[in-house]
Amino acid sequence: MTLTEIKIKIQKLYNTNPEIHINVHCNHPKMYYDNEPAIIRGVYPHIFQLEVKEDNQIKSFYMQYEDVLIKRVEIIELTGSIQPSI
């Protein structure tokens, strides 16, 4: 998948159903989420904004499309392998 394809698919999710599930593994800033419900809050030319609920607080952060390309961020709805959360 190319960056352009990733941008188009994320834009489509944002327009149709922004409630998604993500896997994130980043060291800077330190974020680890597995099959975590999230909401796409914004889509911009080089980044997109996500919100997750953690410890009864909403955390908002921005990710680059490259993060999806290098698999630092996985949007489960893009891969088509939704797993039920335990």
What are these regions (language model features)?
Residues D34-R41:
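Short beta-strand-centered aromatic/proline hotspots
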Residues H21-N23, P37, Q49:
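Beta-strand secondary-structure signal
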Residues F48-E54:
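SH3/SH3-like beta-barrel fold
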Residues G42-F48:
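Short, conserved beta-turn/loop elements at beta-strand boundaries and strand-helix junctions
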Residues M1-Y33, E54-I86:
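Short glycine-rich, low-complexity segments
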